A protein has these predicted regions:
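A beta-strand edge to alpha-helix "cap/lid" segment located at domain peripheries
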Residues: 2-5, 60-138
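A solvent-exposed, acidic/Ser-Thr-rich amphipathic alpha-helical stretch
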Residues: 31-81
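Amphipathic alpha-helical interaction segments
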Residues: 22-25, 43-44, 112, 129-130
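Hydrophobic pocket/interface hotspot
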Residues: 10-13, 25-26, 33, 55, ...
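Short, low-complexity N-terminal intrinsically disordered segments enriched in polar/charged residues
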Residues: 1-31, 133-138
């Protein structure tokens, strides 16, 4: 795929994610996809690298915490060879009524027309506090 095709694939994935069309988003991930988040699991439980099945479970959990979805707005995007780097912001209303807003930098690796690897950088402290409070309110 060309770098433009890779960018389109990533933007399509994030469009599905933002619209809570998680099955369509998952279809764009390779079966052996890994998704990595920074941090230490004892401080940020989502930290580390997970497989596609775990990503699927986490997406299902998102709907419980963010019943109206998580709108993702994309910013700068750069592609080279099989990699796409992208800045983004998210906004959504948590189940406890609080607003959730975070900033991200993603690195996607594309292979055979699918997303093979994702590295997601975000404010893990904010995510832990906001999402933890939403879980506790359910």
């Amino acid at each position: 795929m060309s770098t433009e095709d890779n960018k389109r694939l990533v933007l399509e994935f994030l469009g599905h994610y933002s619209a809570a069309r998680y099955d369509a988003a998952l279809d764009l991930l390779a079966e052996d996809c890994t998704w990595w988040l920074p941090g230490h699991p004892e401080e940020f439980p989502a930290a580390g690298s997970v497989d596609k099945a775990t990503v699927q479970r986490r997406l299902a959990g998102n709907l419980k915490l963010l019943p109206h979805g998580l709108e993702i707005t994309t910013g700068a995007i750069t592609a080279e060879q099989d990699r796409v780097a992208l800045e983004a912001e998210s906004r959504g209303t948590l189940v406890n009524g609080r607003e959730y807003h975070n900033s991200y930098h993603f690195l996607f690796v594309i292979a055979d027309g699918k997303i093979r690897r994702v590295k997601e950088y975000l404010d893990t402290l904010h995510a832990r506090e906001a999402l933890g409070a939403a879980r506790a309110s359910r």
